Amino acid sequence: MEDEPKLPTDDGPTFNESCKISSEILTAGDRKLLKVELLKEETTLVSWKKLMDEASKENGGLFVSAPERLLNANPNLEFRLAPGAQTENEMVNQPHPNRLNSVIAKIERLYMGKDGSDGEELDGAPDDDDYDTEDSFIDDAELDEYFEVDNSPIKHDGFFVNRGKLERIEPSATSNQQQPKKRRRKESAKPCGDVVDVSRKRAKMAKTAGGKDQSASPGPSSKKISNDSKTVQDSFSPLKAQNGNDSLVLENVKHTDKANHQPMNATSPKSKAAGSSGPLHPKCSSKSVHEQSNSPPGKSRPNVSAKSAVVRQQVNNGMPDLDIATESKTSIQISKKSGSNGRPKYSTLEKAIRNLEKLVAESRPPAATENQDADISSQAVKRGLPGDVKLHLAKVARIAYASQGEISGELINRLMGIVGHLIQIRSLKRNLKIMIDSIVTANREKDTRFQRIKSEITEMLKTQVPLVESQETNQEAGTSDDFQDVGSLGKSPVKKFVMDVALEEKLCDLYDVFVEGMDEHSGSQIRKLYSDLAQLWPNSLVDNHEIRRAICREKERRRALEGNIGKEMDQTKITKKKQTQLVPKSEGITYPDKTSGVEVKASVVLTATTTSLVDCQPAADSSFERSKQQHEKLKRTSSLSNPAAEGKKVRRKTEPALEETHLPAEKPLVLALKRQTHLKSKTHKQVQVHPQSKAHKQAQVHPKAKTQTPPDLNLPS
């Protein structure tokens, strides 16, 4: 009766091999025992029910299994459960009446496959006892905890009997810090809301339903599971189509979003089925964003958040939601730097979007950030975009159009999350279309200017290059003598093309047109421009470095010219200021009123002194002219001996001459009036200081008059 056990393969024992392990029945009075041979150096897996079935078949039905004994003990219960005639196989496959066994069997099948519980619990179970995953009233928290797998090692080893929860070895401090991070990443990768959780459970149930035995009786549950799997596939099929057709058609901007005008309570049947999960979306989204910000920046995020954003967008009937914009940020793949520091290397578009977000956050008042959700969902009239925000938005549109060729829907959702409190989505699309149209026209004008200047350069080279080549041939013919330098043997003559100023100006203009509107860090494109321009010269007369040096020389000339123009403008401003200062006032000179007697005396003396001053003025002028002529003669003699000093003097003379040319023609008249008023004020001061001493006044007026000599006391009387 006893058979030899079948040894398993190298892959380890399976559940199919456990049923083939032989057993031996031992009887001791009323007790019946099963003897099983254990495999050497391998784990023996035993199914109690299958061993009982084999023993009963081998003994001719003398050994009855436990379920049969229970059913035969209560015939009334048996009649209620199955009023018809039942065969022996149906009695053997009758499930346990406990409902939790069906749930446990399903969970085991998810992890252990088709033979998880050896097919001994739920081969013909009624469908009404299945776990209803679509019921929103049932709390799935414990079920989710059951799905979590703890990979920590067990404390005890070997064969042991345990009661209660298994004791596990606590990980070290370092692994304890790393394990919650991994769990947080898994939780952040999970989509927010019960709608996607239910679809995940549906997919798992559909997977287990596909692995069941096809011989089982098809009931309503199999149809329901197959329908659920179809609905899950249909729910994810628009995601693929939307990822393919996610671009914005800029020509049809005038279409209006009808979903924006619908009320918030008008939801689809899917949203009614998951109505309890709606208020949890903002909290979950903020939690996921916080967890993703704590994760290291070098690792890429999974694309599950993008799918959840699209599912939630279908639930809200196209309403622009802040959660979509915040979660779409996490779906962007960030490439990691190849260096050892591990800092993320952002693209130019990502940098422009971050700068726009930073600018909007700085310009936004703090009160508006608290009511951000209300501002996004409200359909009130919103303010326009500020000037600096519009400039940054145009930069984002230009970079996106240059790199992608269009503005994608994902980018519009992200921009709406940044500037949604300032502008509506229709206005944003219209502004982006206007910006792109202006960019296209500017690029066309830039291309036409670039080609025109390039054609002018080629025309100039057609006339200059043959002249240079002819000069080189003449020089080679003139230097071809019988004697040749030893050091020049084996060296090819160096050809050098000398550019003139006009050609350098054209090259600089071409460079300015090429660089116009270009972003930073564009050194590779500029080097490519140098190489393309160098190819215009035949026989490699000019290389990239000479092109760059020619452009730099022209830039230096332009900067020097701008500096000279600025100096000339400053000089003209100074001369104009001097002219305004030299213009006299029309009002006469007024003196303070003191006593009337002093005024009379001053007027009398003033008339006498003015006449004397007018008389002596020509004599003083003639003496001044003579001294000036003598001084000029001395300077001429010294300049003949020192020509460098003469050059300096000529430059100094030209500057005042230029200033005098700018002065008006009435300058001599103004100077004469100024000299006369100066003399009047001087004589008036002299009269006030010494009013009594008339001899002293005459001495001041006539300084060359002879003073009276005192009498000599030594002379005889």
Swiss-Prot record:
Comp. bias (Basic residues): 675-705
Coiled-coil region: none
Name of the protein described by the UniProt record: Ubinuclein-2
Compositional bias of kind Acidic residues: 118-136
Compartments in which it is found: Nucleus; Nucleus, Nucleolus
Disruption phenotype: No visible phenotype.
Family: Belongs to the ubinuclein family.
Higher taxonomy: Eukaryota, Viridiplantae, Streptophyta, Embryophyta, Tracheophyta
Segments for region (Disordered): 114-136, 166-308, 620-717
Biased composition (Polar residues): 214-246, 285-308, 706-717
Main function: May be required for replication-independent chromatin assembly.
GO CC entries: nucleolus; nucleus; rDNA protrusion
Compositional bias ranges of the Basic and acidic residues kind: 623-632, 653-665
Motif Nuclear localization signal, chain ranges: 634-641
InterPro entries tied to this protein: HRD
UniProt keyword terms in alphabetical order: Chromatin regulator, Nucleus
GO process terms (BP): chromatin organization
Subunit: Component of the HIRA complex made of UBN1, UBN2, ASF1A, CABIN1 and HIRA. Interacts with HIRA.
